[in-house]
Amino acid sequence: FTDAAKTLVYRTGQVAPTVAWRAGGYRLPTEAEWEKAARGGPAGLRFPHGDTITHADANFYSDAAYANYDFSDPRGYHPDYDEGALPYTSPVGAFAPNGYGLHDMAGNILEWCWDWWSGDYYSTSPYLDPRGPETASSRALRGGAWRLDAGYLRVVDRNNNRNPSYNGGTSNRYFGFRVARSAAGE
């Protein structure tokens, strides 16, 4: 996109070889960093803004199966972004930021993390600052997406790119990324 307010949708396999990920300390966040950022402060909340979610909070697919914490009306794709042309992403800043001032930590697009994916990694990882397994077949994804239900938008929910074709040069309407920056000296 040429408009900075638009959400970047990652074209798998095209960005990584051309980006100097560590230049100036910029990189993808680890899963632990991503989760801390998504919480926006208090631990223990289900979503970045509280324990319930509606279309006023994020861009996602509302499903009645999650009615105990998804209070959206109407159900289905977000009514403001279901325009008939995929992807149904929303502009950056369309929803209120979390406690750290970060937008779209739930919904809109799944975000790549630096960590390799392992479904049981956190059962054996270090308690402080886990960095993910050494290798795996795919990277971890966090945050949910415009086409996913509220269960995927929970701060603790972990995903990976289960479709092997997304590890190649395939474009994808559901994945994106946000950059983190290491503190001086890290």
Please state what every model-predicted region is:
Residues 171-186:
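Short, structured beta-strand segments at or near domain termini in extracellular proteins/domains
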Residues 1-162, 171-173:
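Functional-site microenvironments in short loops/helix caps that host divalent-cation chemistry
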